[in-house]
Amino acid sequence: VAASFLSMTFRLPEPTDDDYALSMNHTNPTPFRFAPLRRASFRLSVTQAGQLPPDDGAEVAIAGRSNVGKSSTINMLTERRALARVSRTPGRTQAINVFDLDPGQRLIDLPGYGYAKVPEALRRSWGPLLEQYLRRRSSLRALILVMDIRHPYGPHDADLIGFAAGCGRPVHVLLNKADKLSRGAALQEMARLRRMPELQGVAMQLFSAQTGQGLDELHQLIAGWLAPGEQKETPTSAGVNNEPSKGGEDS
């Protein structure tokens, strides 16, 4: 992430009781699914801003440090076990990957960052690309930032949140791998993060790309960003395959 991120300051609205409810209520008996996510298809990989699709419609981007479960999150969202490749090699995502949903709707997979073994030249190329994307992309509605709840909020996360918010981009944090902690411990960790001055007003929720915890709430948020005012709920059934992707940790 470009060094200029460090110079940005930001302030987002204070969390509401509804924000807390989103993280608490992960056993909704009537699951919500934003249907276009099930129709996701890979479109292209981008290494230069000029290669991005036309800047129209609406898109949501997903970012995160290497190894936090970003690809597994995309696969869980789309109910496609191999849509985003899950790799045993951190930092595998080396470009912006574009997935088409319904016409005019896109899901954007941003490069994983913060892994020390990624070549320096590659890291330097990511910074300007991410900076241009976040600063100039008018169709970008929100940034979903995936964190490992066991090791959340590092310096790179702080840089990205500050820069995105400084560009006027809503940021929503997924505290992934919440299933690795007890419910009480996960809630305590989220409360600790909410108390951090630099995270005041940053929306966040508990999530698990393995169990689907928090999935309904995330579908509702994405529906609101990509199709405001439209009813896109579809029923789910026990036959839907939400098994985790095979393989190791992902970028």
Segments (PLM) and residue ranges:
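Switch II of P-loop NTPase G domains
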Residues: 52, 92-97, 111-141, 149-163
